[in-house]
């Protein structure tokens, strides 16, 4: 049995990571014999999806930033043990729409919470599991927000309502993460044409699988 592989897709709102994940999935399935599972955070399993609704509900503007962080961690733990780890044990490739880096970028850089606390909580919630590969889709915050506003398919959530400076801090947090872990995190310019982003993503994933 082939070893399972965890690949996370990360990026600020409007970067297009979910669109790219959905586009690259059939290409990978056509190319590879290994089973591929796609999932998302927060969510992926019933308990975590219910937590997702609480976190992203636009009515919950009064939510404390530490409450937000801890809800993400609870959703992460349940999702990991119920869905992700069993798939990896079965030798599957798991494509994850967000994982541990989102908490560092959003609640750390974005909300200003202590990143050392967030990293400890991430380790606690995941038993120190990290992705084998993280694809970070980088886009200027202004471009990301413009895409969100123009999208007719996307449902606006509570985080989309944040001001530009919040999104800029999140992006900076991601860039710092990418600089700190270059062997795990690969940065992709998501301001390119979509077909170029998809092709680059596909190539990077295949290269990592074939190593």
Curated annotation (Swiss-Prot):
Q: What Enzyme Commission number(s) apply to this enzyme?
A: 2.7.4.9
Database matches in Pfam families = Thymidylate_kin
Instruction: Give the UniProt entry's GO cellular component terms.
Output: cytosol
Against NCBIfam families, the record matches this protein to: DTMP_kinase (TIGR00041)
Write the lineage as a comma-separated list: Bacteria, Bacillati, Bacillota, Bacilli, Lactobacillales
- Sum up the protein's function in the record's words: Phosphorylation of dTMP to form dTDP in both de novo and salvage pathways of dTTP synthesis.
Gene3D superfamilies for this protein: P-loop containing nucleotide triphosphate hydrolases
Q: Does the keyword Kinase apply?
A: yes
Query: Which keywords fit this entry according to its UniProt record?
Result: ATP-binding, Kinase, Nucleotide biosynthesis, Nucleotide-binding, Transferase
Q: Name one GO molecular function term.
A: dTMP kinase activity
The gene name reads tmk
Record field: catalytic activity: dTMP + ATP = dTDP + ADP
Against HAMAP family, the record matches this protein to: Thymidylate_kinase
Q: Which PROSITE patterns match?
A: THYMIDYLATE_KINASE
**Can you tell me which family this protein belongs to?**
Belongs to the thymidylate kinase family.
Q: What is this protein called?
A: Thymidylate kinase
Q: Residues that bind ATP, according to the entry? A: 11-18
Q: Which organism is it from?
A: Streptococcus agalactiae serotype V (strain ATCC BAA-611 / 2603 V/R)
Which EC class is the enzyme in?
transferase
Q: Which Gene Ontology BP annotations are present?
A: dTDP biosynthetic process; dTTP biosynthetic process; dUDP biosynthetic process
